[in-house]
Amino acid sequence: MIYYVAMPFIPKDDGLTPGQGAECPSEIAAIRRAEAMSRHEPNVGAIAFSRTGDPNVGEFEDAVILKAFGVVPDDFGYG
């Protein structure tokens, strides 16, 4: 099963912290949602990513960054 997620980033004193992620029905929906999140204060950026896995056994592959908007942490590098 593939999950698509949009997740914003919020500035904190010690850097950026992830905000509340939103599961989306498709890759395009996740990208559009991330773009919208990146423009909504207090967010300074957002990413859209996908993750493949089996929730019944709790096994998931690493996330694949689909698109990044605005400011995101270096460890969420895109491109």
Question: What role is predicted for each listed range?
Answer:
Residues M1-G19:
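Short aromatic-glycine-(Arg/Gly/Cys) micro-motifs in beta-strand/loop hairpins
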Residues M1-Y4, S26-E27, V44, Y78:
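Unusually extended, aromatic-enriched hydrophobic runs near protein termini
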Residues P8-F9, R33-A36, T52-G53:
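Intrinsically disordered, low-complexity boundary segments flanking structured domains
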Residues K12, G19, E27, A63, ...:
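Surface-exposed loop/turn and secondary-structure junction residues enriched for glycine/proline
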Residues D14-Q20, R32-M37, D74:
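A generic short-segment signal for beta-strand/edge and adjacent turn/coil regions
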Residues C24-G45:
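A short, charged, amphipathic alpha-helix used as a generic interaction element across diverse proteins
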Residues S38-G79:
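Short, mixed-charge low-complexity intrinsically disordered segments
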